[in-house]
Amino acid sequence: MADFTLSKSLFSGKYRNASSTPGNIAYALFVLFCFWAGAQLLNLLVHAPGVYERLMQVQETGRPRVEIGLGVGTIFGLIPFLVGCLIFAVVALWLHWRHRRQ
């Protein structure tokens, strides 16, 4: 398993041992391989004739077709993401303030 550690612990004030360079290189190569494989799959999907259209076909004709507009996508996609980021930022600021106060 790759050794990927931070130089300083998040919760205690103690410093951790330095991480190994070969472990970090192996982890970086694994991530690059995953991105490469994903890019190859997307490239295959986009350039293969008719594959994308076949995957997107709905086989059940009894189900109603639902199209999501920009407003609905914004309300149910972007707004929850921004609220989650705001909650994460508030927790991070609170932890930072608490750490500086000690």
Swiss-Prot record:
Transmembrane segments annotated in the record for this chain: 25-45, 75-95
Bilayer disposition of the protein: Multi-pass membrane protein
Stretches assigned to the Cytoplasmic side: 1-24, 96-102
Keyword set includes tRNA-binding: no
Any GO CC annotation of this UniProt entry: plasma membrane
UniProtKB keywords: Cell inner membrane, Cell membrane, Membrane, Transmembrane, Transmembrane helix
Domain of life (superkingdom): Bacteria
Localization (cell): Cell inner membrane
Spans within the Periplasmic topological domain: 46-74
The keyword Disulfide bond is assigned to this record: no
Name of the protein described by the UniProt record: Inner membrane protein YaiY
Native organism: Escherichia coli (strain K12)
